[in-house]
Regions:
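Membrane-embedded alpha-helical segments of integral membrane proteins
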Residues: 25-70
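Transmembrane helix-loop junctions and nearby membrane-interface residues
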Residues: 38-45, 72, 91-101
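Terminal targeting segments of Actinobacterial cell-envelope proteins
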Residues: 1-16, 44
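N-terminal signal-anchor transmembrane helix
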Residues: 81-137
């Protein structure tokens, strides 16, 4: 006497077990990604832990891809759909087509090309020889530094930086508030942003491009916000608000440095939305598709890298050859690009 039914039932149960396991694993990956995605999608002033977690949003694409693969193996349609929607959101945020882009200039508009670099030197600890090498090897014409100290200034002078970039406006300080601008072009101090613990100087750079026979005026802000940690998060938001007000001013604006924020923070995106006449500013790194080219931390704790150093311009300025370069002695990477600045 045979009993085929139980055998079939046992086979189905055996097949169902791995399907359930894959689905559970997919769910375990989906839940935290979905939670962070809600915070990312809603632009409000989130509390400190959420603000810090949002910095790592780009990395969420990896568990989302894995969740989708597990959902397919688990053969749960609702899980496949959920994972697909989450993956689409991560890709949209990773490569945002609604981000600010450089505006095309009218035919015949003269422009001046400038090679620029920015570096947070981490309390002046960055290797001076590497900095000077980057300037020399890449033909850099404008260098901006944060956390600039007297010791770093002395080492850079010994390495010959002032021969390459003879114009400079420096405010060295042994705490994190120091800053410096080195240039081949004449520099004029315009002031500084108000009510910021770290000095954020505004400098007029009188750019000239002999090859193109053009000149342009660039208003440079050396950005260094307080980080969003402990009770300093309110000042971080205030600093970004001050930067936004500067960005709304007329003329060619370059706001470059350590924002201590990523594109995934609504506070930073609010800065990008504050361009003159309501136009969007351009984050050169985001425009170059470099959201997976972290600028911090280059040293120290083994955290997933994030992009907190930015080169932000008004939309009439275009950028090319954006890159991130590591500098020994600093936990930040240097960011570098060539800017095309309209005359005027």
């Amino acid at each position: 006497m045979t009993h085929p039914a139980p055998a079939v039932s046992e086979t189905r149960t055996a097949r169902r077990r791995p399907s359930v396991v894959w689905s559970v694993l997919a769910l375990l990956l989906v839940l935290p990604v979905a939670g962070l995605s809600i915070f990312r999608a809603v632009p409000v002033e989130w509390p400190l832990p959420v603000v810090q977690l949002l910095s790592f949003t780009p990395w969420m694409v990896l568990p989302t891809v894995l969740a989708l693969l597990l959902a397919v193996l688990g053969r749960r349609a609702w899980m496949v759909v959920t994972s697909t929607v989450l993956l689409a959101a991560q890709l949209f945020w990773l490569f945002p087509f609604d981000a600010g882009k450089a505006e095309p200039l009218s035919a015949g508009t003269p422009t001046a090309a400038v090679k620029v670099i920015s570096l947070n030197s981490e309390y002046g600890g960055a290797d001076a020889a590497t900095i000077v090498g980057l300037v020399r090897d890449n033909g850099v014409q404008l260098l901006v530094m944060q956390e600039f100290t007297q010791g770093l200034e002395d080492r850079l002078r010994s390495e010959g930086l002032e021969t390459l970039l003879p114009q400079h406006l420096n405010k060295p300080n042994d705490d994190a508030s120091g800053g410096a601008v080195y240039s081949v072009f004449p520099l004029e101090a315009e002031g500084q942003l108000p009510d910021t613990p770290f000095t954020m100087d505004v400098t007029r750079v009188l750019v000239a491009d002999p090859a193109a026979g053009s000149k342009a005026t660039l208003h440079l802000t050396n950005v260094h916000t307080l980080p969003p940690v402990d009770d300093r998060i309110a000042q971080w938001r205030s600093d970004l608000g001050n930067i936004a007000r500067q960005a709304a001013r007329p003329g060619n604006q370059l706001l470059m440095g350590d924002y201590n924020s990523t594109y995934d923070h609504s506070e930073f995106r609010a800065v990008l939305d504050s361009g003159p006449d309501g136009r969007k500013l351009v984050d050169a790194g985001t425009a170059a598709g470099a959201r997976f080219s972290p600028t911090w931390p280059m040293e120290g704790p083994p955290l997933p890298g994030i992009v907190i150093d930015h080169m932000v311009t008004t939309p009439r300025i275009s950028s090319s050859n954006y890159s991130v370069r590591q500098v020994p002695g600093s936990d930040h990477a240097a960011i570098m690009a060539t800017l095309s600045i309209p005359a005027g």
